[in-house]
Amino acid sequence: MASTSPATTNGDVAPANYDLVLKLAPHLDRHMIFPLLEFNAGRLKEDETDKAREILAAKYALLKKTNMTDYVANLYCELEGLKEPPAEYAERRQKVFHQLEKYEQETAKITELLQRDDVVNNLRSDKVANLEFLKKEHDVTIDMVNALYDFGQLQYSCGNYADASELLYRFRVLSTDNDKVSYATWGRLACEILTMNWESAMEELQKVRESIDTRLANNPLAQLQHRTELVHWALFPLFNYDKAREPLLDLFFNAGFINTIQANSPWILRYLTVAVITNRGRAKNAGVHQKQMKDVVRIVKQEAYEYQDPITRFVHALCIDFDFEEAQQQLVLAEEVLRSDFFLLAHADDFVDSARHLIFESYCKIHARISLKDLSARLGLNNDDAEKWIVNLIRDTRLDAKIDYKEGTVVMNHPPSSVYQQVIERTKGGFFRTQVLTAAVAR
C-alpha cells in the first residue's frame, strides 16, 4: 500500500511520514535523485545528526558508481571522517581523465565537420544518405558516430550535462541505430532537466513520448514501464516551468498515462491533484480545467484504498463527502506536506489559496447567506483575514455577492436554484438528447 495511513486519522501527521522519495527514486535516474536528497538534507534540524548521516550515506551510495570522482571522494571523506581520500580515488580520477582525452580525440574530426556550414548544408533528413555522404566525402565511419554516444555517456556520468547533451544531439542526427537513438533521447531529456533548460526538456519529452507510443506499441509491459518513468521525469518541468503545465496535464490525463498512474504509481496522484487545483485561473480553457478537476475527484475516489495523503484527502472530504470541517483539517495538514515536498514547496501558497476558492465555491452552492464567522472557520482564516480574502475575491472574479457588515454575512445575489428548478433543467436536457437520438435513428 502506497500511503502511510489508510484513513483520515490525524495522529500520523508529520510531513516525514508522507515523504515520497523512496517511491519516486526507483523511477528516476540517479543524477535526478540527488537534488531530492539535498532538499531533504537541507530541511533537517541541527540535532538530527543520525538522519543527516543517513542522507550522506545515501548520497555516497547513489553517486559512487558515477565518474564524479572528486565529489564522491569528498563524500567518502565526510562519511568516514578523513582529511584525505584513499589513493584509489586519485587513480579513478586519472582513469576518467584519460577516457575523456581518448574520446575527445576520437570525436574531434566528426565534431569539427558538424560545425562546418558546407557540411551541415549537405545533410538531409535521410540518415543513411547522410552517412554515405560523410563516408564518401570525409571518411567518417560508424565507429566515429558511436564514439559520440559513448563520449556523451561519459560526460553525463561526470556530471557535465550540457556537454553530454550536445554530444548526444550530434549522435542522434547521424545514427541509424534506433535503440541507441532512443537511449540518446532519454539521455538528452535527463541533461535538459538537470541543466534546467525547460523548453528543450519539453521538446525531448515529446520525442520520448512519441517513441513510447510507436516503437513499443506491440509491447504493453515495456510501454507501462517507460510511461511510468516518463511520468516521474515529467515532474521536474511540471512544477518548474509554467508553459509545461497544460501540455503535461494533457499528457497525464491521456488514457495510456492515467492508466499507468493508477496501475503502477498511484502516488503521482498527489502531484496531479496539486497541478490541477493550482491551475485554476491559469488554464486557457475553463471547460478543460473543470473536466480535469472532475477526473481528479473520480480518481481520488477510485484510488482511496491504494493511496492517500492530506492532499487527496482534502479533495475527498470536500468534493466527495462534502465535509467542510474535515476538508479544512486536511488542508492544514496538506500545507505541511507541500512545504516538505521537493517538487511542491514553491506551490504551497498557491495551492492553499486555490483550495480556499474551492471551499468557498462549494459552500456558496448550498448557501445563499453565509456567516463570515462560519466561513472564516471553513477557510482556516481569522475574521479580518477572511473578510479581506472575500473582498479581494469579489473584486478579482466579479463574483455576484456582497458583504453585509451589519449582519456579518456574505450575501449571494444568485441563490441556488430549487430542487424543482433543477429537475426541470435536467428534464429539458434529457428531452433534448432524446430528440437528437430520435432524429438520428429516423435518418
Curated annotation (Swiss-Prot):
Any one GO molecular function term: translation initiation factor activity
GO biological process entries: formation of cytoplasmic translation initiation complex; translational initiation
CDD domains, A to Z: eIF3E (cd21378)
Keywords from the UniProt entry: Cytoplasm, Initiation factor, Protein biosynthesis
Main location group: cytoplasm
A Pfam family that the UniProt record links to this protein: eIF3_N
Cellular compartments per GO CC: eukaryotic 43S preinitiation complex; eukaryotic 48S preinitiation complex; eukaryotic translation initiation factor 3 complex; eukaryotic translation initiation factor 3 complex, eIF3e; nucleus
Annotated localization: Cytoplasm
Domain PCI: 249-417
Domain of life assignment: Eukaryota
PROSITE patterns in alphabetical order: PCI
SUPFAM superfamilies with a match to the protein in the record: Winged helix' DNA-binding domain
Reported function: Component of the eukaryotic translation initiation factor 3 (eIF-3) complex, which is involved in protein synthesis of a specialized repertoire of mRNAs and, together with other initiation factors, stimulates binding of mRNA and methionyl-tRNAi to the 40S ribosome. The eIF-3 complex specifically targets and initiates translation of a subset of mRNAs involved in cell proliferation.
Name of the protein: Eukaryotic translation initiation factor 3 subunit E
Organism lineage string: Eukaryota, Fungi, Dikarya, Ascomycota, Pezizomycotina
